[in-house]
Amino acid sequence: MSDQLEASIKNILEQKTLKWIFVGGKGGVGKTTCSCSLAAQLSKVRERVLLISTDPAHNISDAFSQKFTKTPTLVEGFKNLFAMEIDSNPNGEGVEMGNIEEMLQNAAQNEGGSGGFSMGKDFLQSFAGGLPGIDEAMSFGEMIKLIDSLDFDVVVFDTAPTGHTLRLLQFPTLLEKVFTKILSLQGMFGPMMNQFGGMFGMGGGSMNEMIEKMTTTLESVKKMNAQFKDPNCTTFVCVCIAEFLSLYETERLIQELSKQGIDTHNIIVNQLLFPDTDANGTVSCRKCASRQAIQSKYLTDIDELYEDFHVVKLPLLEAEVRGGPAILQFSERMVDPEANKN
């Protein structure tokens, strides 16, 4: 259609206010190659770029043929692109927001009553043992605070498959609710503030010190939460392939991001086949022709479903994209749609 948005990531490169960019989708669609390529392009227009892998598989080391750790490391061949790998889900278990909200509601209902202290103990015990994802949420919060202090212009997240990523993006909201409620009930929890502080990795100290630390942390979390839900600061790039399951999961991802108030207006359709033809326009490889026909069907669906998105269509290449020069070359395809016709 004539008013179709440009099939490139130029809109992201031109939006200088962006601070956090998440790249995600179903497993096996090429998220890492796309996130590395996006970071490479951003390094051309921004002063300091950080690429973070939150995927337990940590494929960015393989993509750049360079070992990365938990410390930001300069990517070979670049002057301003750094990369790091973190384990954002050590236990493989997620936070149940419904359980959190139920406990907070119960604690509020019992505030000031005869069962207040008992409920406080139950609340603490539930956090200590019943929600294995709370330490993960705290680690993520501390990581964001640390990254924010390192003065990078923009941060690109190479995320794990969809379900894990959606939990990751819930953490700021989760932490804000938890700390707001704990501080509002500090009269009831006063005798146990040291235990709360230890549980949230804040060390020992007096009740006033614990309250001060929690208040400071809450302010940081509120800032993080506001930024994640601000389209001027944060966006999510969905990566998929032109197949039913991948398209289905992409739609689910976009719906969930919308519910969480997180902006997304870019989709990358990866691994597309453009088979060679003879002088008569016939494709010599029957399997290639069949696969192309399937992909063409889902590309039509994507164009109809996401007409208000920038949809980048990338080809399946003959060789792997590995190493800085190869990633930089591949990244040009995300900027120039004409390059994907070759």
UniProtKB/Swiss-Prot annotation:
Query: GO CC annotations?
Result: axon; GET complex; neuronal cell body
**Binding site residues for Zn(2+):** C285, C288
Query: Could you name the domain of life of the organism this protein comes from?
Result: Eukaryota
Which CDD domains does the record match to this protein? ArsA
Q: Where does it reside?
A: Cytoplasm; Endoplasmic reticulum
Per the annotation, which location comes first and is thus the protein's main one? Answer: cytoplasm
Q: Which GO terms describe its biological process?
A: detoxification of arsenic-containing substance; positive regulation of insulin secretion; tail-anchored membrane protein insertion into ER membrane
This entry's Enzyme Commission designation comes to 3.6.-.-
Residues binding ATP, per UniProt: K26, G27, G28, V29, G30, K31, T32, T33, E243, N270
Q: Which UniProt keywords apply?
A: ATP-binding, Cytoplasm, Endoplasmic reticulum, Hydrolase, Metal-binding, Nucleotide-binding, Transport, Zinc
Active site, per annotation: D55
One of the entry's Gene Ontology molecular-function terms is: metal ion binding
Q: SUPFAM superfamilies in the record, alphabetically? A: P-loop containing nucleoside triphosphate hydrolases (SSF52540)
- Keyword presence, Repeat: no
Q: Which Pfam families match?
A: ArsA_ATPase (PF02374)
Q: Which Gene3D superfamilies match?
A: P-loop containing nucleotide triphosphate hydrolases
Function, as annotated: ATPase required for the post-translational delivery of tail-anchored (TA) proteins to the endoplasmic reticulum. Recognizes and selectively binds the transmembrane domain of TA proteins in the cytosol. This complex then targets to the endoplasmic reticulum by membrane-bound receptors, where the tail-anchored protein is released for insertion. This process is regulated by ATP binding and hydrolysis. ATP binding drives the homodimer towards the closed dimer state, facilitating recognition of newly synthesized TA membrane proteins. ATP hydrolysis is required for insertion.
Its family remark reads: Belongs to the arsA ATPase family.
Q: What assembly does the database describe for this protein?
A: Homodimer.
The protein's name? ATPase asna-1
Task: Please report the organism this UniProt entry assigns to the protein.
Answer: Caenorhabditis elegans
| Encoding gene, per UniProt annotation | asna-1
